[in-house]
Amino acid sequence: MDLSINERLVLRSLDLKEVTAKDLASAAGLKPEAAVQGAAMLAEKGLATLRDEVESEYVLTDEGRKYAAEGLPERVIHDALPADGITLNDLKKQFPPATVNIAMGWLRQKGWAKFEKKDGDMFLLPQKADASADEKMLAAISNGESQKGFDAKVIKDLLKRNLIELRETKTKFVKITDSGLAVKQAGIEITEEIAQLTPEMIATGSWQGKTFRKFDVSLPVQTEYGGRKHILRMGMDAVKRTLIEMGFKEMEGPMVDAEFYVNDLLFMPQDHPARTHWDQFNLKEPKYIHSLPQNLVERVRRVHRDGGSSGSLGWNYEWDETIARKLVLRGHTTSLTARYLAKHSKPPQKYFSVSQVFRNDTIDVTHLLEFCQIEGWIMDDNLSMKELMGTFKEFYSRMGITVLKFKPTYNPYTEPSLEIYGRHPKTGRWIEVGNSGMFREEMMEPYGINSTVVAWGLALERLMMINYGYTDIRDLHGPLCDINFLRSVPVVWQQ
């Protein structure tokens, strides 16, 4: 049988009599922890038995040791009481208030003093005070005497006064088994083993001819949880890689932005329900953006009022720049698209972003107050909805989702518009994973863009729900997310 050097030393030192780990370590010439480890390994192989025996005893606390040496406060006060008594006020002049306060209750409880009211003050008259049970117990513990027969009530009182505490001492006992005895009788050879190969040994060649300890790498070990990316961060990285592979460039921009970029440039009227505090988060301080590009401001004003030169009638109201300057937490990353269209107005263009958005929604299995949106848009001449749907099929197929469904819908800033649905692998339910469409001419008018722009906003969490089979978005994101689930998600390495 293959045994380590420590196992051999321990086995050779064992006999039929059970011994403590401390005595075994001394006999084997090992440190106690090394002897226990060797005995435990022998026990796993059936060559020895290892058991724990716990002994409990009461020991004095720091305060208990002080009182055992100097006397309990009630004993100190009693012994200082004059035979004809003393007032409480005079007593407090002789002893610290804390000592007097502790002693008063115990003097009364033990009957060591008689208390009388006299001239508006408390008068203490000493009584007979033989050694009490708690004093005897403190002395016995202090002197290391046997604790058998200790009175339970006295122990409870001393514990309550924090004068003693229960201390448990664990002793390990080791005994050889019949199998271990057979191995021992067959002869145990003690050969020095090396546990670690060092650079110096390699350089000098001193490792040659040495015996190295064998390690069983198949033995179970404690799981170590190191730092790792959150499942959504891994999902974001995968989406970014996929869109970059498809020829897109990434957009970046502020999470706090003016309503001008979040709503007004998207041809969303200022009285739209989605622009109220019921749906979006407004900033209290600062409340407004410092400035807006005035060339765009005037064009947006005209488009909202009468459609400008887009051929539309607009929304037929007086647009308010003050409302447009209000700062909000962006409810979609289309605010980035609104910013980038002003800088990249000549086709062809392909941009995307994957970032957080914030909506004042009711939290349920598919909605959160904060989630990650996959924003994207393509600008080119003569684009159609066919190219848009083809982009989705290509993107989602690369993300592992091949079954999609499209449904016409309405959006203030796209026409025509489509909702995208993916089928959940477990429930079979169709889940809306995004919204899309072709930007309206009213939205393109302020930029002076004559080319077609198709765009979308997709939900990363819902994509992940389909990929991983989860039915509740809160299982992926937020305080209800299971830590064991996060630890068990495979880490996918990609260059």
Curated annotation (Swiss-Prot):
<keyword id="KW-0067">ATP-binding</keyword>
<keyword id="KW-0436">Ligase</keyword>
<dbReference type="GO" id="GO:0006432">
    <property type="term" value="P:phenylalanyl-tRNA aminoacylation"/>
</dbReference>
<feature type="binding site">
    <location>
        <position position="439"/>
    </location>
    <ligand>
        <name>L-phenylalanine</name>
    </ligand>
</feature>
<comment type="subunit">
    <text>Tetramer of two alpha and two beta subunits.</text>
</comment>
<dbReference type="GO" id="GO:0000049">
    <property type="term" value="F:tRNA binding"/>
</dbReference>
<keyword id="KW-0460">Magnesium</keyword>
<keyword id="KW-0963">Cytoplasm</keyword>
<dbReference type="GO" id="GO:0005524">
    <property type="term" value="F:ATP binding"/>
</dbReference>
<keyword id="KW-0547">Nucleotide-binding</keyword>
<dbReference type="GO" id="GO:0005737">
    <property type="term" value="C:cytoplasm"/>
</dbReference>
<feature type="binding site">
    <location>
        <position position="413"/>
    </location>
    <ligand>
        <name>L-phenylalanine</name>
    </ligand>
</feature>
<protein>
    <recommendedName>
        <fullName>Phenylalanine--tRNA ligase alpha subunit</fullName>
        <ecNumber>6.1.1.20</ecNumber>
    </recommendedName>
</protein>
<feature type="binding site">
    <location>
        <begin position="373"/>
        <end position="375"/>
    </location>
    <ligand>
        <name>L-phenylalanine</name>
    </ligand>
</feature>
<dbReference type="GO" id="GO:0000287">
    <property type="term" value="F:magnesium ion binding"/>
</dbReference>
<keyword id="KW-0648">Protein biosynthesis</keyword>
<keyword id="KW-0030">Aminoacyl-tRNA synthetase</keyword>
<comment type="similarity">
    <text>Belongs to the class-II aminoacyl-tRNA synthetase family. Phe-tRNA synthetase alpha subunit type 2 subfamily.</text>
</comment>
<feature type="binding site">
    <location>
        <position position="415"/>
    </location>
    <ligand>
        <name>Mg(2+)</name>
    </ligand>
</feature>
<dbReference type="GO" id="GO:0004826">
    <property type="term" value="F:phenylalanine-tRNA ligase activity"/>
</dbReference>
<feature type="binding site">
    <location>
        <position position="334"/>
    </location>
    <ligand>
        <name>L-phenylalanine</name>
    </ligand>
</feature>
<dbReference type="InterPro" id="IPR022917">
    <property type="entry name" value="Phe_tRNA_ligase_alpha_bac/arc"/>
</dbReference>
<dbReference type="InterPro" id="IPR036390">
    <property type="entry name" value="WH_DNA-bd_sf"/>
</dbReference>
<dbReference type="InterPro" id="IPR006195">
    <property type="entry name" value="aa-tRNA-synth_II"/>
</dbReference>
<keyword id="KW-0479">Metal-binding</keyword>
<dbReference type="InterPro" id="IPR002319">
    <property type="entry name" value="Phenylalanyl-tRNA_Synthase"/>
</dbReference>
<dbReference type="InterPro" id="IPR045864">
    <property type="entry name" value="aa-tRNA-synth_II/BPL/LPL"/>
</dbReference>
<dbReference type="InterPro" id="IPR004529">
    <property type="entry name" value="Phe-tRNA-synth_IIc_asu"/>
</dbReference>
<dbReference type="Pfam" id="PF01409">
    <property type="entry name" value="tRNA-synt_2d"/>
</dbReference>
